[in-house]
């Protein structure tokens, strides 16, 4: 890339200590390689291996840390304290986006449609939860990404093992109403919603889980999504409202469902989405003619324009 020197010395932050470390290592290496190919003076920086105080001396940071510590406002706060511009969402938006319940509360308060939920524990009145949400439900740790610790529950006796599995990853666990229909993901880049992607996991997968996201090669990605032009536009507009309402900025991804009646339901937001070979952000960018190297440079360039922090 011409004029790559304007970025100065760039720390590509990846790895970290969260349950998503392995995904972050793959994503971060891909981003690092892309920036180096583009002539950027980029270096790997793993906060698990090095003290964040060593970030002094870098001119800006490209955050590719997934999950807690990297996607929840912590590293963003450190970078602001060090006065280092960084990619993506700021401290508050990151903290909200990492918390599925806070995200839903803000969406609900803004009259945005999101799947109904309840906080659950091993002591919860399961009959009351089933009466409220119906069956099936999906059990989720509130502060994990990449579908880690998630389970589909189809009968009441399946609650206990599902809650136990989720509790292994997070002290706070939620049950979310199962939306029967089609799953979509929408990438936001520089204030615009990119073409909607339809996710079609294989028949033997209950939902778009960790294996489907990162291990399997038989997941189908629909670009174009198959939605009508009006529904595509409606979902893109809904995504932008959802993205900005939680205080997200720069780049990210919103997951949504369309139920059997054609209604859209917001599920969650990812403020530092995956950038692996299986990941959805590169697929959406490719659909509008932005290759991976150009995508990484465009995200980094947000640190120059005020679109990021």
UniProtKB/Swiss-Prot annotation:
It catalyses: 2 D-alanine + ATP = D-alanyl-D-alanine + ADP + phosphate + H(+). Keywords: ATP-binding, Cell shape, Cell wall biogenesis/degradation, Cytoplasm, Ligase, Magnesium, Manganese, Metal-binding, Nucleotide-binding, Peptidoglycan synthesis. Disulfide bonds: none annotated. It comes from Acinetobacter baylyi (strain ATCC 33305 / BD413 / ADP1). Residues 104-301 form the ATP-grasp domain. The lineage of its organism: Bacteria, Pseudomonadati, Pseudomonadota, Gammaproteobacteria, Moraxellales. Belongs to the D-alanine--D-alanine ligase family. Mg(2+) 2 binds at residues 268, 270. Mg(2+) 1 binds at residues 255, 268. It is an enzyme of class 6 (ligase). It is found in: Cytoplasm. Its cofactor is Mg(2+); Mn(2+). Transmembrane segments: none annotated. HAMAP family: Dala_Dala_lig. This is D-alanine--D-alanine ligase. GO terms for molecular function: ATP binding; D-alanine-D-alanine ligase activity; metal ion binding. Cell wall formation. One of its GO terms (biological process) is peptidoglycan biosynthetic process. Its EC number is 6.3.2.4. Pathway: Cell wall biogenesis; peptidoglycan biosynthesis. The gene is ddl.
